[in-house]
Amino acid sequence: MILNWKLLGILVLCLHTRGISGSEDHPSHPPAEDREEAGSPTLPQGPPVPGDPWPGAPPLFEDPPPPHPSPPWRDLPETGVWPPEPPRTDPPQPPRPDDPWPAGPQPPENPWPPAPEVDHRPQEEPDLDPPREEYR
């Protein structure tokens, strides 16, 4: 409880020394920072007007840089050379009828030995639910 009274006393002391009150009887002294910047532009008084820019705000778009004497996109070769010819590529050849693997890289050789023969006959399934003996 003592702590609350101390905080209240500090708050009242701060409010009294800063001159903050509910009435306009005492004009407050401007802080030292405001007195130094007397030449700075004043802030707008009242609510902002829709559409008006905020004072001192930077422009939305910067001005484009000045044009250079020869921009890189204008350094094109002579008109007879443009557009350049694409590199020549041979068209793909149709597969030959006797070619088992027509185009592209050849398949790798199978490194695995052949699998053993598997008996595919149906096996008798074990009875998972054997009959129970009746206890008397």
Swiss-Prot record:
Identification of the protein by name: Psoriasis susceptibility 1 candidate gene 2 protein homolog
Lineage of producing organism: Eukaryota, Metazoa, Chordata, Craniata, Vertebrata
Chief location category: secreted
Signal peptide: 1-22
Domain of life: Eukaryota
Compositional bias of kind Pro residues: 44-74, 83-116
Cited InterPro entries: SPR1
This protein's record includes keyword Disulfide bond: no
Pfam families xrefs: SPR1
Keywords assigned: Secreted, Signal
Compositional bias segments (type: Basic and acidic residues): 23-33, 117-136
